[in-house]
């Protein structure tokens, strides 16, 4: 009886939702709506209210028949208002950095009212507040700098850019040298994303202010390295791509950073970490050269597949993470294997997340206090 009642209620809810979606949109009368933190300066929408509801509006072509909103990979049917504009009011399916697109008769279109970020192309995204993740909010603490650093790559035959975070005290303590973390992005991003989307600098500032992290330098390089004549249209795992990065990273990027920044140039004070493809780089290049990197962080980038390559005399920590909706059992098994072989290894599983930025922000937050101790 209870089963039939629940099914009837579910069917009634679906019917009401469908009927509501098909009707004319009636704008809310409450004036408690305000622009979101991700709404473009000139735009009126999206808006958010105190109940955490988000209001999206889009002017589709007059010929549009079927309009939906894709919000954090969940589709919501849109309604037209009296002026012919399409509207959706919905609560966010997930917290953190989320994709928003309009689907107009099957075509996916960025929301023109939102800021654009780069991830496998330019996308409209929105930042959904997460009270339990306050560690990446800007606070009244000393702030470091993020510097745009250029160096010439003979391997590529062109100038390359890296972003370098230096702690707040860096310029005021010219005689001090610092540990360094080389932090890599994923296949869909570039060297800007760890600071722009991942909030790496803010996370480091807050942890340093709490005395949970030794002041450090963070270097963010681009994963992609192409020799002259290489097919740039190939995907990240193209022939020799990994080897190209390895050579550039070890023979050009590292020496250049050590020549221009006051880093401590030994394995005990050098870490490597990355998300997704950057985690795969850490698990290959970092592991193969564990004589150079004492601290390794693999975020949603697989696991250490060949522990025999790890140097027991230099490796201080192997840290593997993923979202709970990815492959936590595989990580936990690999970490147990590494511990059995005598390595200091640890894992972290981000609750309720998948292959996404909230997983990687949390992973960095968990990783940083463990290194250079």
Predicted segments, located by residue:
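Bacterial N-terminal signal peptides that target proteins for export
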Residues: 1-9
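Bacterial N-terminal signal peptides
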Residues: 8-17
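Non-catalytic cap/lid and distal C-terminal segments of serine-dependent acyl enzymes
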Residues: 22-75, 80-373
């Amino acid at each position: 009886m209870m089963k039939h009642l629940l099914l009837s209620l579910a069917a009634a809810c679906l019917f009401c939702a469908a009927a509501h979606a098909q009707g004319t949109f009636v704008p809310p009368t409450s004036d408690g709506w305000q622009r979101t933190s991700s709404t473009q300066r000139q735009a009126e929408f999206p808006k958010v209210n105190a109940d955490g509801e988000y209001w999206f509006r889009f002017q589709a072509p007059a010929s549009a028949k079927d309009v939906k909103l894709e919000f954090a990979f969940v589709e919501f049917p849109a309604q037209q208002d009296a002026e012919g504009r399409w509207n959706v009011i919905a609560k966010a399916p997930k917290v953190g950095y989320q994709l928003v697109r309009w689907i107009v008769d099957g075509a996916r279109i960025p929301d023109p009212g939102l800021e654009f970020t780069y991830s496998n192309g330019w996308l409209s995204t929105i930042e959904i507040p997460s009270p339990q993740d306050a560690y990446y909010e800007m606070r009244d603490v000393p702030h470091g700098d993020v510097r745009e650093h250029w160096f010439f790559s003979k391997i590529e035959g062109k100038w390359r850019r890296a972003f370098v975070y230096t702690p707040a005290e860096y310029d005021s303590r010219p005689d001090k040298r610092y540990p360094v973390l080389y932090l890599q992005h994923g296949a869909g991003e570039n060297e800007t994303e760890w600071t722009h989307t991942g909030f790496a600098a803010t996370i480091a500032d807050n942890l340093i202010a709490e005395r949970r992290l030794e002041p450090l330098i963070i270097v963010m390089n681009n994963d992609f390295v192409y020799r002259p004549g290489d097919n740039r249209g190939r995907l990240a795992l193209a022939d020799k791509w990994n080897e190209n990065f390895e050579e550039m990273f070890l023979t050009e990027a590292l020496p250049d950073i050590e020549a221009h920044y006051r880093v401590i140039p030994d394995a005990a004070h050098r870490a490597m970490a990355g998300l997704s493809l950057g985690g795969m780089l850490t698990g290959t290049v970092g592991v193969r050269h564990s004589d150079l990197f004492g601290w390794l962080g693999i975020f949603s980038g697989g696991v250490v597949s060949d522990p025999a390559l790890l140097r027991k005399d230099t490796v201080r920590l192997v840290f593997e993470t993923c979202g709970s909706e990815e492959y936590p059992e595989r990580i936990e098994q690999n970490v147990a294997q590494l511990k059995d072989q005598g390595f200091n290894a640890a894992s972290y599983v981000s609750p309720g997340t998948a292959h996404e930025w909230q997983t990687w922000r949390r992973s960095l937050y968990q990783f940083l206090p463990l290194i250079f101790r």
